[in-house]
Regions:
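Phosphate/pyrophosphate-binding catalytic cores of soluble transferases and nucleic-acid-acting enzymes
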Residues: 1-285
Length: 285
C-alpha cells in the first residue's frame, strides 16, 4: 500500500484534546478515525469513557467505537486482531487511518507488533508473592542485571513481572523489551504520530471540567445500568467511585473528588508512557 495512506497516530493523556486534534487531521488528510482507547471499545459507557459524541464525529467515519459488549473481555492482543483489518480496509480505499487514543500498550501492539513478552503465570506469581522484594531483586540481578538496574526497584509487582519474563522465556527481559522497542512494522513505515502535551495546570483544569460534565451527563446512569455485569469495562476510571456513591458510601462531591484524583494519576502514567516513545512528534497545546 502507498506510504501516503500509512496510519497517523494521535496520542496523549486523557482530556488533552485528542478527539479535536484527530478530527482536524482527518480533514486535512482525507482520513477516517480509528479508536485506540481500551474503554471506548465498549458499548454502554460512552459518557464514562469520553467517546466522541455524534455531534463531534460530524461527517467523518469512525471505527471500533462501541463495538464490544460490556461483558466481553479485551486485551492488547485482541485489539490488534480487530484493528489490523480495519486499517487495511481504510487504506485500500485510499483513505488515511487516524488512530486516536491514550491506551499506550494497545497502540504499541499496532506500531511495533504483538509483544514478545509471555503472559503471566499464576502459579509462578503466587510463589513470588511469598518472597521478599530483596530476594526477588537478588535473583533478577543475577539473571538480568540490565533489567534489574532499570526496573522500578521499589515496586514489587514490577520486579515480579521482570523476573517472571526471564524465568518463563529462559532469556533476558531487558533484551526482549529492547528488541520490541527497536521493531517497527511495514504497515507503519514511515511511522507518524503526535503526542499532545498540555501544561500541567491546564490539563488538571480540563480533567476537572470533564469529570463534572461526565457526572452530569449520564456516567452515573451508565454504571447503574451495568450493575451486575462483569468485564474489562469495570476497570474504567470512575466505575469504582460511582459505585461507592450509588451505595451511599460517599457523597456526590466526594465521588467527583476521587475521580478527579484518579484521572490525574492516570494522566501522569500516560505521559510517562508516551515520553518513552521517541518517534512521536511533540505537540504543545
Amino acid at each position: 500500500m502507498s506510504e501516503f495512506t500509512a496510519p497517523v497516530f494521535v496520542c496523549g493523556a486523557t482530556a488533552s484534546g485528542k478527539t479535536g486534534y484527530a478530527l482536524k487531521l482527518a480533514a486535512e488528510l482525507d482520513g477516517e478515525i480509528v479508536n485506540g482507547d481500551a474503554f471506548q471499545l465498549f458499548r454502554g459507557i460512552e459518557v464514562l469513557s469520553a467517546a466522541p459524541t455524534e455531534e463531534e464525529r460530524g461527517d467523518f467515519s469512525h471505527h471500533l467505537f462501541g463495538v464490544l459488549d460490556p461483558a466481553e473481555s479485551c486485551d492488547a492482543g485482541r485489539y490488534f486482531e480487530m484493528v489490523e483489518p480495519v486499517i487495511s480496509e481504510i487504506r485500500s480505499r485510499g483513505k488515511v487511518p487516524v488512530v486516536v487514543g491514550g491506551s499506550g500498550l494497545y497502540l504499541k501492539f499496532l506500531t511495533h507488533g504483538p509483544s514478545p513478552l509471555p503472559k503471566g503465570d499464576v502459579a509462578m506469581r503466587a510463589e513470588m508473592e511469598r518472597r521478599t522484594l530483596e530476594d526477588l531483586l537478588l535473583e533478577l540481578e543475577r539473571i538480568d542485571p540490565v533489567e534489574a538496574a532499570q526496573v522500578n526497584r521499589v515496586n514489587k509487582r514490577y520486579v515480579e513481572r521482570s523476573l517472571e519474563i526471564c524465568l518463563l522465556t529462559g532469556g533476558k527481559a531487558s533484551e526482549l523489551r529492547d528488541g520490541w522497542e527497536r521493531k517497527t512494522r511495514d504497515i507503519e513505515k514511515p511511522l507518524k504520530g503526535f503526542w499532545l502535551i498540555r501544561d500541567r495546570a491546564d490539563l488538571h483544569q480540563r480533567i476537572e471540567k470533564r469529570t463534572v460534565q461526565m457526572l452530569s451527563e449520564g456516567a452515573v446512569e451508565e454504571v447503574r445500568r451495568l450493575d451486575g455485569v462483569s468485564g474489562n469495562w469495570e476497570k474504567a476510571i470512575g466505575v469504582k467511585e460511582i459505585r461507592r456513591f450509588l451505595s451511599g458510601e460517599i457523597s456526590r462531591d466526594k465521588c467527583e473528588e476521587l475521580i478527579v484524583f484518579a484521572t490525574r494519576q492516570y494522566a501522569k502514567r500516560q505521559e510517562t508512557w508516551f515520553r518513552r516513545e521517541k518517534w512521536l512528534e511533540r505537540v504543545g497545546l
